């Protein structure tokens, strides 16, 4: 790996930068509309050469001097669209008029938001229709004002029409900003000459509110796009979960077009004082009578918190901190739960789980665009959605984050089951699998919380198992069919279902209580009356169905990585038998929802295991145990599955942190200096707060290093590489010929390489290299020889040397 400096946060302000967020000096005039992002400019009306200045409660084009101009911070809301943020921390905006102000007040009120949730947004649509109909007659767009809050009336689209010449359009009203008599700013249907503007670099802008990253130093990147990578992997993340379960369960979101002040706010139904937050109390072990503080940005007195499970923990700047700290790959699992969505009274989205998958896939591409917009244009952002291992390797070697899409739902591909009758066919599975592949999905689980037409589920233990069993009944018409496992099944077991007389205060660590399932129990107020089960250990009779076996084989054919987590023990065993028989390496156990018999089989197949992150002490112990399962034929790398935003608690503070604390600042991956993370007025400390939000994962890894030394960190830095090599084999690339069970390459095979081939073409032709250093690959050949393929600066094969 070569350390290069890329877009670092300097200690002082860069001229023309509102917040010292960018290190590359800006040109006096932006080269295109994307270059405006994060910059500080004077806005000049080219028809009069006058700059925008303040005038009463608005702005006019009123001065020929840049020194007198209002310094405007351009805050990107999407590619080419901006909030124009003034020195008084206000916005250049169109007046919303009398009706518009009433509509805004109604929709933003607690009552308005709750009614909107209960009616799935139909009341909001009706109110908007009234505003759109009556707005123009009551002042909507009648003036350009200094708006107090960001809104669609302050969200401007910038287009370049000539060199140094731009138009400013308000998409909400489909009108252009123009300059009239006396420099008055008006809206017009056409831009014309009076609607042409230029932007001149200046300083003095107000700082737009934002979460701090708190990481300094170089970003580790590769010397070439195709060499071996280093970096951490999280194979189980739910970044788009703000849209799941109807879209009203989680409070906050990973980004908002209008910034952190809109993204990190509590839910309206948590007011007043958190007393309405029943689900939060259930999931996080609180008391709805006592409530909780609801302040979000900038004080965060209660949330984010490692065990506050209805509040956002994966804001994009927190993810940026994790990326700067060494995260180079993660799988965002598109997630939903029909049962809980049907029960929860507030919603804005469909409860169909596959509708949720489609919506969240759309949203994550919107986030990619948003980060691109902050970074200077299309493709410039550090957050890159990838669909094959070659693309992912290139992204990581560029020093960016490779994002894989996956699915974790109970009724995957709409393949539910009712009274043992499946609701899908093999043909429908094929068609729907093609659809999600087209969405970019490359990693999938077959089940989540309930049996479906593909597989039985492992179930939950303890009191939570009672409610998930009830949920299974409501979703499938059948209780979980558990029986005592046969002795020969050994440790291949499901979670033991308790009978009613078993509920005698068994610790949650034994009952296996799960936040999502507990939410269903408390939200319904039902304990259920489940069957009387025989003695444990329990095994779900429902194993892998013929439809499930068909789907796994189709996933293998399409190169989709299979995750056995949440399947019943017998289904997992049968699934891994298929993986073995098909010699399919595309398997990952992403977050510890399998059993101890499965993890060695995953690694033996050439797959990857990324256990549930949780507390650093427990994770260290898991690493020490699982490392013994490593198969020497494959690169061993270790990752984690955070399950963040998926109703899974993050790691709390280590109990003995006071005796052996993480000390700040510390040196992270690639020589970075990692300080305590600051979000508004709140400063976080891993020793006190645990993993309160995703930005504290670099701190968590440092905590691991304190316990396990450099060895555990080294294995985790190989996590992304191990996954990439597994992914290559998943899509049909032949294994490394240096393996003892793989035939060495012949002269004829190596001779089939042609000058000018790309690294991808070389690998597709003769298989995985044994080493990938800088611009050269090595391969094992017959006769104990080594072939070295060398590439030029453009990434094309120039020579193959055999020695």
What are these regions (language model features)?
Residues 1-23:
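Secretory targeting and sorting signals
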Residues 31-42, 223-227, 750-755:
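N-terminal helix-cap/turn-to-beta initiation motif at the start of protein domains
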Residues 38, 227-230, 234, 774, ...:
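Extracytoplasmic
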Residues 89-105, 154, 744-755, 761-763, ...:
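Long, charged/polar, surface-exposed segments that mediate recognition or autoinhibition
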Residues 741-743, 755-803:
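A cross-family detector of function-defining hotspots
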